[in-house]
Amino acid sequence: MSDLLKLTVYVPASHLDAVKDAIFAAGAGRVGDYDRCAWQVLGEGQFRALPGAQPFIGTVGALEQVAEYRVETVLPRAALAAVVAALKMAHPYE
């Protein structure tokens, strides 16, 4: 398992399943004879969009707090580019 990388991503609750489906389809989450392996926990993220940002949630200049999941999974090094591309396509944030 030395060729495995760990991916950690924060996802709004509304897009949790879509993001996981995308990264799993691209090759993440396989450990031995198991697939779709991940660890997740619900928390609260916060941010303030600065001028020039196009926030998915909230408005520029306002502090936002949103329910987000921290998702951790593993992926083979060879799948890194595909998993990152799938993550960017499925994730709603800029």
Located regions from the model:
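Hydrophobic structural segments
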Residues: M1-E94
